[in-house]
Amino acid sequence: MQLHLSEPPLTQGECALVYCFAASGGNGRFPLPPEIASWDEKAWSGLVAETVQEQGFQGKPNSSVALRLTGEIRKLVLVGLGDPAALTLEALRRATANGLRQAHSLKAKQVMLSLPETGLDRVRGVQAVAEACLLVAHRDNRFKSSAKGEEENSFSVQEVTLLVPGLAQARPDYEVALQRAIEMAAGTILARELVAAPANIVTPLALADTARQLAQEYGLEVEILGQEECEALGMGAFLGVAKASDLPPQFIHLTYKPAQGDPVTKLALVGKGLTFDSGGLNIKTDSRSIAMMKTDMGGAAAVLGAARALAALKPQVELHFIVAATENMISGHAIHPGDILTASNQKTIEVNNTDAEGRLTLADALVFAEKLGVDAILDLATLTGACVIALGEEIAGLFTPDETLAQELQQAANLSGEKIWRLPLEEGYFEGLSSIVADMKNTGPRSGGSITAALFLKQFVEKTPWAHLDIAGPVWTEKDAGYNNKGATGYGVRTLVEWVLARQAAAACS
């Protein structure tokens, strides 16, 4: 999709998308926006007002009206924003996506989108609208065999012009916002496609190849550690999980450094990279559950998607992107329940459940990250079903002992629209991981499962500020909603980018 910036007003075009705030009272005749009311009276003989009245459109959130017309504007979409005082960037994204879905239903190829006057930061509004346009248009047809099937599943809208009031006064700022949206959406789409691809396509080797491609395209440093290198570093937890797979483990380390000048801060982003999780000898028995275990590398996908976006945006920040990639399979080499593994920080782990393998791979990844001397570590993982039970399928769980980091990540999530909710790191629950033969077990009681999982990870970070995002719920959706289509969402990429850019801005001001 091509995106352009231009000045209002609406003049002519195939399709116009116009935002509408909710009418006061909400039950009377809806007042059309002035620009549309004028067109309706002069060119459309009141057809728009009549249709709006018939359909009961009142400008409420998630509501819209789509019409075919004659004249210089041949198709029109009105989309509701609700109460202007309650409008958020995420509501603007969702309304934009709703409107573009309606434009798609009209088979529109070109859309003129008139940005509303709101209380939101206008530059941020342009970024949010552009993100929604690019993300709702994404269709993953890689594995369809026929051109006809691909055409039927493609998004009709190919070009959107954003009409921005006051564009001329701050065009450079708007162009920066547009480019940021383009790169963030591209990173999100990369993450979506990694998560959506089956485990026979996205293997540990394929993730490593993706990292190499990013390094080549964006000038990143890349280090891929194989079995022997990981053994030399004492990564017994990671390699314990990897033992049963016929595919070799790949420990991925991408590094971005500013081209000029010293970095204002150094950060590590760590993603869980289980390209398939059978459960191991504690095999998953639910056929639906095991079929979806291609998504168990959603954290790795978010980290690689963020690497793609941030390398293009070039912040003055040193960034380390880390993924311990492997499968959790069943074979004669598989770890047994009761085995003891030694992680690279020399802590020992009794494996009382082989289906709690992600935290084992993350243990060595976190130790590796801290040794890099970074200022903060953030890991993302599709870690626990318990978090999905607690927060549902749209919200990630945030765990951190660091108040500043918690606030930073919440602010980043507010900007991205990717929902997070902080859950407690209740230290007393670590008793549930106690072992009589090792330093800890890898799982505790069923109750508080997402908390004990986070407490387990905490044992592998000594001093560096650290946060953990459990993204098991929002990494996938079973319905078209907002700018996400059914399937992989690419969750986490935009929050990571917003967090890194905010850390850069804060460091530059200090």
UniProtKB/Swiss-Prot annotation:
Main subcellular localisation: cytoplasm
Positions of Mn(2+) 2 binding: K272, D277, D296, E357
InterPro entries: Leucine_aapep/pepB (IPR011356), Macro_dom-like (IPR043472), Peptidase_M17_C (IPR000819), Peptidase_M17_leu_NH2_pept (IPR023042), Peptidase_M17_N (IPR008283)
Cofactor binding note: Binds 2 manganese ions per subunit.
GO annotation terms (biological process): proteolysis
Catalytic activity: Release of an N-terminal amino acid, Xaa-|-Yaa-, in which Xaa is preferably Leu, but may be other amino acids including Pro although not Arg or Lys, and Yaa may be Pro. Amino acid amides and methyl esters are also readily hydrolyzed, but rates on arylamides are exceedingly low; Release of an N-terminal amino acid, preferentially leucine, but not glutamic or aspartic acids
EC numbers on record: 3.4.11.1, 3.4.11.10
Active site: K284, R359
Amino-acid positions noted as binding Mn(2+) 1 in the UniProt annotation, renumbered to this chain: D277, D355, E357
Protein origin, superkingdom: Bacteria
Gene3D superfamilies reported in the protein's UniProt record: Leucine Aminopeptidase, subunit E, domain 1, Zn peptidases
Keywords in alphabetical order: Aminopeptidase, Cytoplasm, Hydrolase, Manganese, Metal-binding, Protease
Cofactor(s) in the UniProt record: Mn(2+)
Gene Ontology molecular function terms on file: manganese ion binding; metalloaminopeptidase activity
Pfam family for this entry, one: Peptidase_M17
GO (cellular component) term, any one: cytoplasm
PROSITE patterns: CYTOSOL_AP
Compartments in which it is found: Cytoplasm
Family per record: Belongs to the peptidase M17 family.
NCBIfam families for this protein: PRK00913.1-4, PRK00913.2-3, PRK00913.3-5
Purpose of the protein: Presumably involved in the processing and regular turnover of intracellular proteins. Catalyzes the removal of unsubstituted N-terminal amino acids from various peptides.
Name used for this protein in its record: Probable cytosol aminopeptidase
This protein's encoding gene: pepA
